[in-house]
Amino acid sequence: MKCISWTVNGLRACMGKGFADFFAAANADLFCLQETKLQAGQIDFAPPGYHAYWNYAEKKGYSGTAIFSKQEPLRVQYGMGKEEHDREGRLITLEFPAFYFATVYVPNSQRELTRLDYRMQWEDDFLAYLQTLDQNKPVIFCGDLNVAHREIDLKNPKTNHKNAGFTDEERGKMTALLGSGFTDTFRYFYPDATGIYSWWSYMFHAREKNAGWRIDYFITSDRLQPKLRDAKIHTDIFGSDHCPIELDIDL
């Protein structure tokens, strides 16, 4: 099973930069989007052969997620069932016979860390949600987790130590998640790889200099490790400040 995740930073803008071509060429079984920045009816994208699921933020032009699946799921859930977290279109979960599959756009802690306290609450509630799913079936989830976990996951760790996405608090929550029975699939295959990132600022020619961060992930329940085949980061694909990531798994 081939899974793709891409934080598109506005799907309408990305459509003008080759999105549909990449979608068709990828031919993924599951294709996930984060940061769609859409409201219902604002785009006409219904690829043949896929079931489409969209979650929109109440605030226009903000956040949003989508999943395109070749197989129709047993059930779809939008959000995690907590009103304070479910207004921004950040989470979609599909239930299949043998596993759960979710895409998520984790809240950014913002400059000056103005949303860090909220982010910490989100992290605790999201982990509890994942653990509840995991008690029933193994879980795969993907998306922009808005954290570089280790120093090798960004180009400039020292100068970013207290910036959103690389605070001790955010990294600690990621450590806790991975210590709760979940696997960072890219690091499973490439534990020491450096210089491979999924996001680059639009400023300072960051992508040209590869001054990036790895903040997009495919995470699975640990018990799916024997079924993992590869994890990829498509740094050659443009169209957003993020590039697509991929998981190949025998399911």
Language-model region placement:
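Active-site-proximal beta-strand elements of phosphoester/diester hydrolases
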Residues: 1-9, 98-110, 142
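N-terminal, active-site-proximal structural segment of metallo-dependent hydrolase catalytic domains
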Residues: 1-47, 51, 57-62, 177
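Structured beta-strand-rich core segments of catalytic domains in phosphoester-bond hydrolases
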Residues: 37, 42-109
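Metal-dependent phosphoesterases centered on the DNase I-like endonuclease/exonuclease/phosphatase
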Residues: 51, 125-211, 215
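Conserved beta strand-loop-helix elements of the APE1-like EEP
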Residues: 60-75, 196, 203-226
